[in-house]
């Protein structure tokens, strides 16, 4: 009797060669095959008579092969197989590209169900490269819902179906269900065996929907259990205790009145740091909400209690900017601020490292250089990571390891609806900065088409003439070779703008430049040595240039809404009225509607909600902390209610049984899900 832990290479029709290819999809055993869910489904249950095909679309057709399939070698690298098929209502051409085996698989006079895209009209109607299944003589309705699996070069859907069919044959009572029976009953979820069968071999759309609902709940429940265990495990560690006696002097030293949200976040941090457990908190806020002030509050707390704080930024130029912002705030309190970056001279590094090791450097700001082996902290008590999606769990852990169990504060400028944040960052507590400090005027935002090109170029010239500076952002570095989607690159835009505005100073910045070169260009732009900076999205998280008051984004339909909102946040940081112009309003109704959202609101949380709803979570949460388990089934936009249920149930279960000792199957699945974490909480 085959077992779910058997190797897939012994499945008939697979063998060692295809087994190697399947490994690329992380499929080594039959169990892996069962846990590799279809990425899509093709509904072939609706059979369309040939005569009723009236538009270019995918169809399932039950028809007989009418002419002998002929192999035509058009040229090297291109083979066509052509035949005609017919049913009671009409005939249809069939063409396969580069699949000479199709000629051997189809027999004249044999009936098949063909599924594929039909193009053309009248006698020219053709179904291209369809899937086909032979109709058994006694079959009255052979159409079915067919799973579509992820593939890699050298594998076909039939290979995945073979492996999955063999895996499904092992599904018996031996398949353990990680979901407690009470939960399955409460949410009316099918058991694991029925759900897996319906995921891979759905009989109806309802079967498929119920199975998916079960798998989504399971995935989110396992994730929430693991994150909750991780959080509780960290809380069990003894942490450094900071008293908050000096907070009043910190607030008094600020050159402005903090917002209510800033004050609330700092008080939440102070409470965490006084609890005797290591803090692990995320502060998220919109562009310009004042996260650096919150970080300064933690730095002050650490220093006032005799400990050091380390502040990591994703780029050297941002690290320098943070140091410049923090130094005057902390200097009033007698707290020193030291910068450490990779590009410093050897003498500068030696001086900084000595100050860090002796404790003379109370607050240290830097990049990944802070986690290198040569950096020895005297008494590291707090770690701050800016733009956490650019610093993974591993880097945070490496810095934390330098100080035992320091307090950790993570800052993100990507606003996320709070319900989602509590789940996606379930290993962290969450503070939200939902107020913008007074004095920042809204950025006037416009969505335009190519017909406005000359006017926008003139507007750039006008704003520079009035003393401002402009960003122009492009999605590509070099020109696209695809004529249909040809997008002008950053380099070409810079050349064109320089020709149109020869009296203006134009610079170009993109991701392929060396860090030192990028930093120098940004410093020169900030020092007003350039009027216009043409760039790719490397400026999305960039230096603060208060004098820049115009952002122009080319091909804005190529960016996500949240990314466009981040880009808009590069301007509006000074006293000048600022503007943002998105090109792409003439790219169709969908593009127009998306850009209209940005024109209507400057609220990053509102933009994030729209982004999730429109793009789905895949791209949006590509920014999730690296190192935590990926979601394979759940859709964060569509499954919000199930997500909330899963979180509540995980918290309730772990409150009653923190180690999951009474749920060994669930514990095993959680450990497997978090295996790559290699965290002691799961050993």
Residue ranges of predicted features:
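Inter-lobe coupling/hinge segments of SF2-like helicase ATPases
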Residues: 235-238, 264-267, 278-596, 656-657, ...
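OB-fold nucleic-acid-binding modules
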Residues: 36-66
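Short, surface-exposed secondary-structure boundary micro-motifs
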Residues: 64, 117-118, 226, 556, ...
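Long, highly charged, low-complexity intrinsically disordered interaction regions
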Residues: 1-12, 20-23, 222-223, 233
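Upstream accessory/linker segments immediately N-terminal to the RecA-like ATPase cores of bacterial MutS
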Residues: 18, 71-253, 623, 656
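C-terminal accessory region of SF2 helicases/translocases
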Residues: 575, 587-683
């Amino acid at each position: 009797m085959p077992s779910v832990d058997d190797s897939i290479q012994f499945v008939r029709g697979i063998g060692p060669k295809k087994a190697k290819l399947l490994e690329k999809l992380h499929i080594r055993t039959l169990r892996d095959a069962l846990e590799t869910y279809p990425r899509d489904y093709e509904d072939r249950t609706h059979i369309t008579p040939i005569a009723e095909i009236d538009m270019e679309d995918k169809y399932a057709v039950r028809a007989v092969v009418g002419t002998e399939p002929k192999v035509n070698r058009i040229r090297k690298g291109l083979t066509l197989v052509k035949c005609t098929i017919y049913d009671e209502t009409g005939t249809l051409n069939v063409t396969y590209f580069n699949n000479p085996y199709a000629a051997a698989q189809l027999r004249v006079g044999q009936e098949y169900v063909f599924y594929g895209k039909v193009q053309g009209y009248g006698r020219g109607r053709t179904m291209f490269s369809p899937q086909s299944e032979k109709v058994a003589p006694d079959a009255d309705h052979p159409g079915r819902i067919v799973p579509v699996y992820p593939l890699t070069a050298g594998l076909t859907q039939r290979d995945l179906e073979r492996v999955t069919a063999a895996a499904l044959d092992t599904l018996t009572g031996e398949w353990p269900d990680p979901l407690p029976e009470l939960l399955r009953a409460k949410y009316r979820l099918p058991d694991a065996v029925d759900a897996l069968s319906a995921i891979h071999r759905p009989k109806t759309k309802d079967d498929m929907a119920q199975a998916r609902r079960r798998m989504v709940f399971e995935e989110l429940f396992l994730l929430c259990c693991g994150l909750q265990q991780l959080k509780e495990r960290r809380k069990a560690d003894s942490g450094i205790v900071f008293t908050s006696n000096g907070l009043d002097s910190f607030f008094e030293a600020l050159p402005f009145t903090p917002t209510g949200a800033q004050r609330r976040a700092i008080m939440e941090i102070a409470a965490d740091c006084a609890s005797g457990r290591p803090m692990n908190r995320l502060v998220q806020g919109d562009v310009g909400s004042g996260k650096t002030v919150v970080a300064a509050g933690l730095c002050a707390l650490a220093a006032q209690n005799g400990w050091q704080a380390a502040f990591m930024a994703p780029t050297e130029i941002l690290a320098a900017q943070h140091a410049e912002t923090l130094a005057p705030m902390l200097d009033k309190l007698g707290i020193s601020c030291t910068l450490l970056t990779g590009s410093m001279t050897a003498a500068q590094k030696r001086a900084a490292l000595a100050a860090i090791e002796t404790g003379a450097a109370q607050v240290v700001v830097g990049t990944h250089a802070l986690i290198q082996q040569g950096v020895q902290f005297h008494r590291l008590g707090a770690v701050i990571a800016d733009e956490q999606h650019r610093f993974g769990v591993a880097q945070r852990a490496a810095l934390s390891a330098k100080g035992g169990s320091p307090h950790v504060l993570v800052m993100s400028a990507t606003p996320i609806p709070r319900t989602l944040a509590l789940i996606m960052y379930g290993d962290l507590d969450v503070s939200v900065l939902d107020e913008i400090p007074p004095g920042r005027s809204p950025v006037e935002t416009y969505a335009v088409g190519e017909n406005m090109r000359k006017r926008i170029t003139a507007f750039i010239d006008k704003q520079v003439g009035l003393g401002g500076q402009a960003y122009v952002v492009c999605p590509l570095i070099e020109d696209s070779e695809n004529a249909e989607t040809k997008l002008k690159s950053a380099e070409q835009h810079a050349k064109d703008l320089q020709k149109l505005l020869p009296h203006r100073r134009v610079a170009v910045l993109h991701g392929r430049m060396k860090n030192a070169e990028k930093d120098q260009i940004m410093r020169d732009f900030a020092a007003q040595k350039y009027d216009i900076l043409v760039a790719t999205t490397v400026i999305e998280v960039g230096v603060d240039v208060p004098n820049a008051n115009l952002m122009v984004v080319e091909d804005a339909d190529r960016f996500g809404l949240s990314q466009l909102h981040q880009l808009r946040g590069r301007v509006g940081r000074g006293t000048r009225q600022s503007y943002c112009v998105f090109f792409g309003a003439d790219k169709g109704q969908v593009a127009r509607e998306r850009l209209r959202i940005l024109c209507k609101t400057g609220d990053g949380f509102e933009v994030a909600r729209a982004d999730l709803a429109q793009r789905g979570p895949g791209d949006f949460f590509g920014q999730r902390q690296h190192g935590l388990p990926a979601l394979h089934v759940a859709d964060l936009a569509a499954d919000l209610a199930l997500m909330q249920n899963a979180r509540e149930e995980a918290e309730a279960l772990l409150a009653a049984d923190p180690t999951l000792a009474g749920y060994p199957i669930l514990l095993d699945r959680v450990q497997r899900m978090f295996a790559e974490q290699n965290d002691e909480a799961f050993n």
